[in-house]
Amino acid sequence: MSENQDLQQGFLETVKFDEKGLVPAIVQDHETGKVLMMAWMNRESLEMTLERKQACYWSRSRQKLWLKGESSGNMQDVHDILIDCDGDTILLKVSQKGGACHVGYHSCFYRKAKDDLSMEICDTLMFDPEEVYGKKS
């Protein structure tokens, strides 16, 4: 199929979901390009995201749709949705309200390796997860 024919296909038909019906979604800040998180999407969550322009994912642990920010208020307004050349990875460009990470940081990628193989925090703590989600028992 030529690239022009491929572009004429619907976006959803281009996505190659895995055997579990999922596709990885990389989430990037719309203005800075900073990578905020990685999550999984199924067809329903992708359709919802396209329709609402707010990020919705599939929670593998809870086995249900997860509207980002529904508990914390840290919503992701979607500006662009891109697909990679193989059709098996989605890129969402978003405006992040508050922190993207459930442990309170702006990005889930808040730790970096140092030369001595230890780690350091390289991001901003945006909120206290115990205050937002409650204490875990």
From Swiss-Prot:
It catalyses: 1-(5-phospho-beta-D-ribosyl)-5'-AMP + H2O = 1-(5-phospho-beta-D-ribosyl)-5-[(5-phospho-beta-D-ribosylamino)methylideneamino]imidazole-4-carboxamide. Pfam families: PRA-CH. InterPro entries: PRA-CH, PRib_AMP_CycHydrolase_dom, PRib_AMP_CycHydrolase_sf. Pathway: Amino-acid biosynthesis; L-histidine biosynthesis; L-histidine from 5-phospho-alpha-D-ribose 1-diphosphate: step 3/9. Keywords: Amino-acid biosynthesis, Cytoplasm, Histidine biosynthesis, Hydrolase, Magnesium, Metal-binding, Zinc. Its cofactor is Mg(2+); Zn(2+). It is found in: Cytoplasm. One of its GO terms (biological process) is L-histidine biosynthetic process. Zn(2+) binds at residues 85, 101, 108. It is an enzyme of class 3 (hydrolase). GO terms for cellular component: cytoplasm. Binds 1 Mg(2+) ion per subunit. GO terms for molecular function: magnesium ion binding; phosphoribosyl-AMP cyclohydrolase activity; zinc ion binding. Homodimer. Belongs to the PRA-CH family. HAMAP family: HisI. NCBIfam families: PRK00051.1. This is Phosphoribosyl-AMP cyclohydrolase. The gene is hisI.
